[in-house]
């Protein structure tokens, strides 16, 4: 049945709906029967708070397994015809008990795969109205005996009197009602205040990974693709958008309500379903192929959306050519939201973003922020092909979505910025390093992995999935060549369009396309065999290089492990390939710039003939491989000498690899740290971003181990001596005058990072400069009640550091001013900078106050989405490590009370609070919290935090005193 033949009843508040609405509102925490639709906090506090049913109580995690949550496979959806009526306050009159609820009616066309007498759908925190449910097959009505809800399993079951037969076509009609909550899942509320002080609320959906079931009873698994026809009934004065283009213009007005209808989508997974109801405004453009492109935002932010529009149009045009597949929808909307749980979400045709991920104004956004927006736009638009057009079958292959999108975003952002080389190089800093760090610990997981618990679905959205996935794809592209890689990807997308795929499907297409690349055995490489080694087992190799004789080097491999005593999860412990890999080996010999490639096979060492085994030899030249290198003492000496004599023999990418791998080798006791510091002596001649940035990262990692101990001072002095030549070349004035020049991107960011590093190391010269800017431009120019974006005229790259060191050096008087600016500010990015500055305070009492206010859900001081960032702000403070750990132990119930319903937020707070652990006693406290803390066992972040903390404590035992003596002697 088509939508034209349907009877619409949602405009009428039926008695049964009124009863259900009253029940829902009464049941919602913070709502009462007497709710009005006036825009007060209490009136729309539809918050969800964790309870025993949600979490399994204190002693045990009895949440359902992933298998329990799976739907029976006896029914398959073909299409959904969905109508939703949203009751938003502040626009039209409606019964107060309807405030911040929505009525829903869905007609699901299905086909029976196996005979059955029941239909099971996913449903969570919405109430199905049995009296408004109907099942028909052709012109025959079938009796529904009962409707059973299974809240723990997030399912609703329709028991049918007569058996449904194989291949039978059926139409299930379901009426239901739900809450527009503040849980960031399903249809939720996003709030903001207009410039005249008027509070506003909008309704928007977020359904990935498993929250479409909060919005509509459906088959909420990626493999159940179907066409969606959406109609939204919304208050007069608002606009509605959905995945498809509108088919009735601005909608049909009936009294106080508007009915907006949208074009049926292509076949897609339920998690991509999206709607929004708001009074946002848009700017519009069009691609060369006629795709209408709109950017939506709060009206007062519309002037900041031009860069996103230009970037989006440029990117989608490029992708159509790059993938050789036209964008299949008639329009693409992108929306900047005040409240949003992720950075962005790739809903097909209606991408949602946090405001700080889409808005842009060069007065307030530094070059790095601008690049981040280009990357996120490119990432989400890549998803329109990777994820939307072709979708993984199940979340155990999420990397097919996210790894590919992370990989492709750097290609797309290269087109947006017109600087492909910059994006490829930045990949090393922001993606490859992140992946190597995440995959070095025992709490990692393979790219393709078995999901056993429901919580693991959300936990799969991590650095392994995103960063390692992208890094492995980058290595594969370098191995087979860009054209073959692009062609294989295009063929994969075409073959599985509007369908689902697994990793094996991807590699099978590569096998068809890639037939002439020599593999490790000298025969044509089979991509399936090669790639599976990197996707089905966790970890990565470190290649050890040793001199075998005067003309031969011996290369061997082993798994790189941050802590060899840590134990993997049982299901990852015995992989098929035994933690061995066939490794494409790029290398450089002596003082030659030529890069050669060979293979190190997984089952045998490589004896490599070289012209002079006594010459320096570098592995992973240009750093496209997902592995590390190590050398014997003599090998490192030769590399160090080459860097001192002529470091430009190696490209900046190769120098980046050498420095990173040296720090990594020292961290696992493979070499002495003195070797690393000797290597860094060449840095006084270094001017390139990639090597210096990774050097500063390594230095920072060491200094974190010293914390605020007295021994930290000589260490800081030593590190300042290494960076002093670059600091003397860096200038705040140069940054302020040139940051808008995109060609100076790396130069600007390098100078800024060096200056900030010097400040962090305790340089009074640096801190005084920032403090003077704070006094001159903030304290002297900002009047009471002004927002920072109204009164602070500091160059965008400097704003965050000026605020931070203003508070750090100025104390309470500066903190009070920043607090005032923070309260008045409406630009999300500026608010982030100001909140970070509050975390820079030297007073622990002030830091505690910041966290307590952040957790207070009766206050709007910190938006819920920003709570993890507030914890990270405090954790970044050198004095915050011990304090924030104690805060976690003592205030765990408060943390759960505040954000316990957002699993991913708690997963981010735990590592922030444990990043400063320095003793075994603290580890024991953490283990006790994991075992006995309310609901703590459900959070996988504890295992990771305990492992990293143990690594940190072990490092301190092994290296602290020795390095303290070294730094003291070196700085006498």
Swiss-Prot record:
Top class in the EC scheme: hydrolase
Disulphide bridges, residue numbers: 759-766, 804-840
Site (Transition state stabilizer): 466
EC number of this enzyme: 3.4.11.2
Residues the entry annotates as binding Zn(2+): 379, 383, 402
Entries under PROSITE patterns matching the protein: ZINC_PROTEASE
Cytoplasmic compartment residues: 2-17
Main location: membrane
Co-factor(s): Zn(2+)
Catalytic activity: Release of an N-terminal amino acid, Xaa-|-Yaa- from a peptide, amide or arylamide. Xaa is preferably Ala, but may be most amino acids including Pro (slow action). When a terminal hydrophobic residue is followed by a prolyl residue, the two may be released as an intact Xaa-Pro dipeptide
Residue spans of biased composition, Basic and acidic residues class: 47-62
Protein location: Membrane
Annotated binding of substrate, by residue: 208, 343-347
Cofactor note: Binds 1 zinc ion per subunit.
Residue intervals passing through the bilayer: 18-39
Glycosylation sites: 99, 227, 549, 858
Superkingdom to which the source organism belongs: Eukaryota
UniProt record, GO biological process: peptide catabolic process; proteolysis
MF (Gene Ontology): alanyl aminopeptidase activity; metalloaminopeptidase activity; peptide binding; zinc ion binding
Bilayer topology annotation: Single-pass type II membrane protein
Gene Ontology, cellular component aspect: cytoplasm; extracellular space; membrane
Residue ranges of the region described as Disordered: 47-66
CDD domains: M1_APN-Q_like
Family recorded in the similarity comment: Belongs to the peptidase M1 family.
Protein name, entry field: Aminopeptidase N
């Amino acid at each position: 049945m088509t939508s034209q033949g349907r009877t619409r009843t949602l405009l009428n508040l039926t008695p049964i709906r009124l009863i259900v609405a009253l029940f829902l509102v009464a049941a919602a925490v913070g709502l009462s029967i007497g709710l009005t639709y006036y825009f007060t906090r209490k009136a729309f506090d539809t918050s969800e708070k964790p309870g025993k049913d949600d979490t399994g109580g204190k002693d045990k995690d009895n949440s359902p397994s992933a298998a329990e949550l799976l739907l029976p496979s006896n029914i398959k959806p073909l299409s959904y015809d969905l109508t939703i009526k949203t009751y938003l306050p502040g626009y039209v009159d409606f019964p107060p008990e309807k405030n911040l609820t929505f009525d829903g009616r869905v007609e699901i066309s299905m086909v029976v795969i196996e005979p059955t007498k029941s239909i099971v759908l996913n449903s969570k925190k919405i109430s199905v109205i049995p009296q408004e449910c109907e099942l028909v097959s052709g012109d025959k009505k079938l009796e529904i005996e009962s409707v059973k809800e299974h809240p723990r399993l997030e399912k609703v079951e329709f028991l049918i009197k007569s058996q449904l037969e194989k291949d039978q076509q059926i139409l299930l009609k379901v009426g239901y009602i739900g809450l527009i909550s503040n849980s960031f899942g399903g249809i939720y509320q996003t709030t903001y205040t207009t410039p005249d002080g008027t509070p506003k609320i909008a309704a928007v959906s977020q359904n990935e990974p498993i929250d479409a079931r909060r919005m509509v009873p459906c088959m909420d698994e990626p493999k159940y693709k179907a066409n969606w026809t959406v109609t939204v009934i919304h208050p007069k004065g608002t606009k509605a958008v959905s995945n498809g283009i509108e088919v009735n213009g601005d909608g049909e007005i009936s009294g106080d309500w508007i009915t907006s209808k949208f074009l049926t989508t292509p076949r897609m997974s339920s998690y991509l379903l999206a709607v929004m109801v708001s009074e946002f405004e848009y700017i519009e453009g069009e691609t060369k192929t006629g795709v209408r492109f709109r950017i939506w935002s709060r009206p007062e932010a519309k002037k900041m959306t031009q860069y996103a529009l230009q970037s989006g149009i440029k990117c989608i045009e490029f992708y159509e050519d790059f993938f050789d597949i036209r964008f299949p929808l008639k329009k693409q909307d992108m929306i900047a939201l005040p409240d949003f749980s992720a950075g962005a979400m790739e809903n097909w045709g209606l991408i949602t973003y946090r405001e700080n991920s889409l808005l842009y104004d060069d007065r307030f956004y530094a070059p790095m922020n601008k690049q981040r927006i280009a990357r996120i736009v490119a990432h989400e638009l890549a998803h329109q092909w990777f994820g939307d057009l072709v979708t993984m079958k199940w979340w155990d292959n999420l990397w097919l979505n996210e790894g590919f999108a992370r990989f492709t975003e750097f290609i797309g952002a290269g087109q947006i910025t017109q600087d492909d080389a910059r994006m490829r190089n930045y990949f090393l800093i922001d993606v490859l390093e992140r992946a190597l760090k995440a995959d070095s610990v025992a709490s990692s997981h393979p790219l393709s992995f078995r999901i056993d618990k429901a919580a693991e679905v959300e936990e799969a959205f991590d650095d392994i999935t995103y960063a390692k996935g992208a890094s492995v794809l980058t290595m594969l592209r370098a191995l087979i060549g860009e054209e073959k890689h692009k062609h294989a990807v295009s063929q994969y997308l075409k073959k599985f369009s509007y369908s689902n795929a697994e990793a094996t499907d991807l590699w099978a297409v590569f096998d068809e396309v890639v037939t002439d690349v020599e593999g490790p055995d000298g025969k044509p490489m089979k991509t399936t065999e090669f790639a599976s080694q990197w996707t089905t087992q966790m970890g990565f190799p470190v290649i050890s290089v040793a001199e075998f004789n005067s003309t031969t080097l011996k290369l061997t491999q082993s798994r790189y492990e941050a802590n060899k005593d840590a134990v993997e999860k049982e299901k990852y412990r015995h992989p098929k390939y035994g933690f061995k890999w066939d490794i494409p080996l790029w290398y450089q010999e002596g003082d030659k710039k030529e890069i050669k490639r060979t293979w190190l096979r997984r089952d045998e060492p490589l004896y490599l003939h070289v012209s002079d085994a006594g010459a320096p030899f570098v592995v992973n030249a240009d750093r496209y491989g997902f592995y590390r290198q190590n050398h014997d003492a003599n090998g490192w000496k030769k590399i160090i000498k080459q860097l001192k004599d002529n470091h430009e023999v190696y490209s900046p990418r190769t120098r980046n690899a050498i420095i990173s791998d040296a720090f990594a080798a020292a961290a696992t006791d493979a070499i002495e740290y003195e070797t690393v510091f000797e290597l860094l002596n060449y840095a006084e001649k270094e001017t390139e971003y990639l090597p210096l940035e990774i050097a500063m990262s390594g230095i920072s990692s060491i200094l974190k181990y010293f914390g605020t101990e007295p021994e930290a001072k000589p260490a800081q002095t030593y590190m300042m001596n290494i960076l002093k030549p670059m600091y003397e070349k860096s200038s705040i004035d140069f940054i302020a005058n040139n940051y808008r020049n995109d060609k100076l991107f790396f130069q600007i960011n390098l100078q800024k990072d060096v200056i900030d590093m010097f400040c962090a190391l305790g340089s009074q010269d640096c801190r005084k400069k920032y403090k003077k800017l704070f006094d001159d431009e903030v304290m002297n120019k900002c009047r009471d009640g002004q927002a920072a974006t109204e009164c602070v005229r500091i160059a965008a790259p400097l704003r965050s550091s000026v605020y931070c060191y203003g508070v750090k050096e100025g104390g309470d008087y500066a903190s009070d001013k920043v607090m005032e600016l923070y309260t008045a500010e409406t630009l999300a990015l500026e608010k982030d900078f100001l909140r970070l500055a509050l975390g820079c305070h030297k007073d622990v009492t002030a830091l505690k106050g910041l966290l307590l206010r952040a957790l207070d859900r009766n206050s709007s001081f910190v938006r819920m989405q920003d709570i993890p960032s507030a914890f990270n702000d405090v954790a970044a403070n050198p004095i915050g490590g011990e304090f924030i750990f104690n805060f976690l132990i003592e205030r765990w119930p408060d943390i759960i009370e505040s954000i316990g319903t957002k699993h991913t937020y708690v997963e981010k707070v735990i590592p922030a609070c444990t990043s400063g652990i320095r003793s075994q006693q603290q580890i024991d406290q953490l283990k006790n919290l994991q075992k006995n803390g309310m609901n703590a066992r459900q959070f996988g972040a504890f295992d990771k935090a305990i492992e990293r903390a143990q690594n940190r404590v072990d490092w301190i035992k092994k290296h602290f005193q020795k390095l303290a003596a070294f730094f003291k002697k070196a700085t006498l």
